[in-house]
Amino acid sequence: MASVEEFRNAQRAKGPATILAIGTATPDHCVYQSDYADYYFRVTKSEHMTELKKKFNRICDKSMIKKRYIHLTEEMLEEHPNIGAYMAPSLNIRQEIITAEVPRLGRDAALKALKEWGQPKSKITHLVFCTTSGVEMPGADYKLANLLGLETSVRRVMLYHQGCYAGGTVLRTAKDLAENNAGARVLVVCSEITVVTFRGPSEDALDSLVGQALFGDGSSAVIVGSDPDVSIERPLFQLVSAAQTFIPNSAGAIAGNLREVGLTFHLWPNVPTLISENIEKCLTQAFDPLGISDWNSLFWIAHPGGPAILDAVEAKLNLEKKKLEATRHVLSEYGNMSSACVLFILDEMRKKSLKGENATTGEGLDWGVLFGFGPGLTIETVVLHSIPTVTN
């Protein structure tokens, strides 16, 4: 008879969790930042607020965003005007839209990841789903499992209302699942739509205005597993370690409250400073065991909370400008998609590496870091190891 220790050891994988495929998706409706102030003040019936519109236009100009994809259309706002009003009761209709669209958008990204992976979906043993958009029972994970036709025995983890750091959280969770369940293949999906936070402008809520200028809709998916079969699977990045911490006395720095009016968003002006002043401690704790202290020797996947955060991190760590190129590209093309962002950036990183004929999926470098920042103020740190690129 096997001992408990032998039984437990037999359940564990031998190697590190590895990302095996990536997929991303957005809604069809695209808005351009150059004329978004005109659009936003028109659809929210706020064109009389001329000075606030000028202020909002300046925020948009400084955002470094070219375009975003947003599920809400002008026609939908005409049909449901309370969504576009400032602080009008609207949670019911928001929830009705969200609970249908979040799983659907997640499905689109998941199908792309599954297609790239190339294996039968019956091999998916675990599903980790994350969204800040809406809550229901059974959750978006259950709906997605049914939309994809996953096995009824798939083991599901549903993460609600984690916010922008959760792209790191889902990878940390998937790593634990893959490494502690031999043969596991974990489908990870982040799906975010701004229906939950969209509302009209107010002079008394400038932090809400910042959110209206930054956030976009998108979904991303990865498949994670240990001990990949390289004859049929293509490893992209290894998840070497993962950690989470929160900055003391910063609970209100980034915050959201789900109320009758939807999800309200609150932001302290010193968030870029809080993050940049604490990020090196996270790097040191993560990379000291590997003997790495040169942050420019890493490839970087950082949640693009906004240009001010990226600029502050870049300056504090003396990073070369090219280090955050992939992050800035995703911010420019999609805006801040909350939890979905870092997986978009991973996708951009590996595509850029292959296109540039780099030696590894990490722009030719071996080691990298993935950061998520969000409410708490919480920081997720994931140490990545790239994979040599294979050219046919």
From Swiss-Prot:
Keywords: Acyltransferase, Cytoplasm, Plant defense, Stress response, Transferase. It is an enzyme of class 2 (transferase). One of its GO terms (molecular function) is trihydroxystilbene synthase activity. GO terms for biological process: biosynthetic process; defense response. Its EC number is 2.3.1.95. Pathway: Phytoalexin biosynthesis; 3,4',5-trihydroxystilbene biosynthesis; 3,4',5-trihydroxystilbene from trans-4-coumarate: step 2/2. It is found in: Cytoplasm. Signal peptide: none annotated. It holds the Pfam family Chal_sti_synt_C. Its main location: cytoplasm. GO terms for cellular component: cytoplasm. Substrate binds at residues 55-58, 267, 305-307. It catalyses: 4-coumaroyl-CoA + 3 malonyl-CoA + 3 H(+) = trans-resveratrol + 4 CO2 + 4 CoA. The active site is at residue 164. Belongs to the thiolase-like superfamily. Chalcone/stilbene synthases family. Mediates resistance to pathogens which are sensitive to stilbenes. Homodimer. This is Stilbene synthase 6. It comes from Vitis vinifera (Grape).
